Amino acid sequence: LQYFKEPAPQQRIIATPGQNTHIPVWLLGSSLFSAQLAAKLGLPYSFASHFAPRMLGQAIQLYRENFEPSEYLDQPYISMGVPAVVAQTDAEAEYLATSAYQRVLGLMRGQSLKLKAPVATMDGLWSPAEKMSVDNFYAMAQIGSPDTVKAGLEMLLEKYDVDEFIFTCDIYDTDKRI
């Protein structure tokens, strides 16, 4: 973090560009270690629950309990990653989400991560065990109509009391994504 400040007289490494930029630095992590480090450094913490949701609750608690105020932040500040697919209807959103499911399936199989066109059904594309793994990967996903997603986000906010959401949106059709 020192590299983003005014260089010290004996400092051998100078961030260029970067020095004296005073950019906000966050720690993005998906583990309890990253939560502890963000707390110790007094940095805002962004939990990568958009792909690794399993330890979200524990990490948030650990971060809050161990937070040390710093020159960067007076109190804990947390964001969480949320995969989101929003469409006019729940059915359309579920259809569009099959592109994201196929991407994670490819990741698990060591195949291409290129986003694929949505499919009418994932049946036959994944085994029951693979479906369970994809479901776990997307445990925080909010997929549906605007009302459905709003209700889901309100539930996440109530449960985790985060300050911000960061969204990932794996939708094949650019017009639908925007």
Label every PLM stretch briefly.
Residues 1-14, 54-161:
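An alpha-helical appendage that flanks or caps ligand/catalytic pockets
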